Amino acid sequence: NEQVNEFRNRPLSNTVYPVLWVDALYEKVRVDGRIVSMAILIVFGVDENGHRDIIAVEPMAEESRSPYGVLFQDLKDRGLTTPKLIISDAHSGLVSAIQESFPGASWQRCKVHFMRNILAYVPQKEKKSFASVIKEIWLAPTADLARKRAYDVMDAYAKRFPKAVQCLENGLEDSLTFYAFPKLDARKISSSNMIERLNREIRRRTSVVGIFPNEASYVRLMTTYLMEYAVDWSVSRAYLSQDSIEATLLIAA
């Protein structure tokens, strides 16, 4: 417990994290005799050397009007400085909290979540073929070419999948933010896939638990698992190259 609390509350003032990823992990937890789906908010960062770190493991503050705002304020209280880029899905409460808490930071809408949002408006039998079409948008070498590909898709499918096209149009620009950071690995900063892979691994490990008896046990076990990954990452090769991080900090300065 002491190690878990120390990890979750450690100061962040001695490290700069230019890039953050934010996501939530849901598990079944027993609360007041009921079984509920409870979220833990996880924030990953890449430091100036390009190494990954886990900087927040926080249960969703359901009683708060802005649980993400509470999370970000806690990070700032621990010494986190405003990052250059934050990657997440487009949950409205999350996006507004990012804008309010970190003015000046760029926000990248996770392209994988965005594709799922778009495909939700496409008939099941046509999802696979349409997914292969829209995926090409974010593989374009430049933002201008990505926009052109997106507009071509909109023109071609406006009548066939009007709601999907509207979704694409509404969220397109936020999904192209990563092009403003050309020195960084586009595959890694255009989505939160890294967190999703980790979440799948954690779910595999928590499946033996089934239902957590309370929130404290949930937070404790999640943090313990994540601490193990943080240790591994600290001695593994950089996730983003140090040169690309330094170049990004210079450009954004």
Where do the language-model regions lie?
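Acidic/histidine-rich catalytic cores and adjacent linkers
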Residues: 136-253
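Amphipathic alpha-helical transducer elements in NTP-driven molecular machines
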Residues: 19, 37, 62-69, 88-95, ...
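Conserved beta-strand -> loop -> alpha-helix junction used to position metal-binding or nucleic-acid-contacting
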Residues: 85-92, 97-133
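Secondary-structure boundary/capping positions in well-ordered alpha/beta enzyme cores
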Residues: 82, 105-106, 164, 175
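A short, charged helix-loop
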Residues: 60, 118, 129-133, 137, ...
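RNase H-like nuclease fold core
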Residues: 1-87, 92, 96, 101-104, ...
